[in-house]
């Protein structure tokens, strides 16, 4: 069965690209036609590309690989958080802090600070500190949680990035390139597909389109990790039978 159907893509508006004056000629191979000054993406190609990306993410996750979901534009923020959490992966949905990948040690220090503040709140330290100090510490904790909450359990660099709108997330793309981390991305008609390892040609501005495609990448992880659990159970059962 296909990973995604033309009907699903059409209903979510994945085929609507940008205005014809705002385009990247390299996306020509993924464009079906032009209608009322807007490029229409070739959904037959999108179906194939979603499948390629899905298979890549599934295999990566099955091998224990970790994916970082990145989407900081308003239309992507909720989907990125919800879908990454659903499949147990990491996410950044507010602002990409420069050096998140290339200066990972410094980011880790800020994450350690966040965890320390959370522990202080949990163990009652805040209750014995002066009120003014607690207000400042809570503000600091909220700010760190806002920007780093989605990666606070990421103890090493991710094995792949899933990005919504590579133009908007160009710093993340550049950092991933520098570290040879593969990139899967929703690529609209105004983006450069050559920067992306697994291109998903599609509308990166409509909430429904973003939700659908992000959900499919999360599904790939869920399929891989739940399958791994079943396999482990089967192995355990076989071991029990042979040792009995």
Curated annotation (Swiss-Prot):
Belongs to the universal ribosomal protein uS2 family. One of its GO terms (molecular function) is structural constituent of ribosome. SUPFAM superfamilies: Ribosomal protein S2 (SSF52313). This is Small ribosomal subunit protein uS2. It comes from the Bacteria. GO terms for cellular component: cytosolic small ribosomal subunit. Keywords: Ribonucleoprotein, Ribosomal protein. GO terms for biological process: translation. The keyword Transit peptide does not apply.
């Amino acid at each position: 069965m296909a990973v995604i159907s033309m009907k699903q893509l059409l209903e979510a508006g994945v085929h609507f690209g940008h205005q014809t004056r705002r385009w990247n000629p390299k996306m020509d191979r993924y464009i079906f036609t032009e209608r009322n000054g807007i490029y229409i993406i070739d959904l037959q190609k999108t179906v194939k590309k979603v499948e390629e990306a899905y298979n890549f993410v599934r295999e990566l996750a099955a091998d224990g690989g970790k994916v970082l979901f990145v989407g900081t534009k308003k239309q992507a923020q909720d989907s990125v958080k919800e879908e990454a959490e659903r499949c147990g992966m990491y996410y950044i949905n507010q602002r990409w802090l420069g050096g998140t990948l290339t200066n990972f040690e410094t980011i880790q220090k800020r994450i350690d600070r966040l965890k320390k503040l959370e522990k202080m709140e949990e163990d009652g330290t805040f209750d014995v500190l002066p009120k003014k100090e607690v207000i400042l510490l809570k503000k600091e904790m909220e700010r760190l949680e806002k920007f780093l909450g989605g990666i606070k359990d990421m103890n090493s660099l991710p094995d792949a990035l899933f990005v919504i709108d590579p133009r908007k997330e160009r710093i993340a793309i550049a950092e991933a390139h520098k570290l040879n981390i593969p990139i899967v991305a929703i690529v609209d008609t105004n983006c450069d597909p050559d920067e992306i390892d697994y291109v998903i040609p599609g509308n990166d501005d409509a909430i429904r389109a973003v939700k659908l495609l992000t959900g499919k990448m999360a599904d790939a992880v869920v399929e891989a990790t739940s399958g791994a659990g079943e396999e482990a159970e089967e192995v355990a059962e076989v071991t029990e039978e042979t040792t009995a």
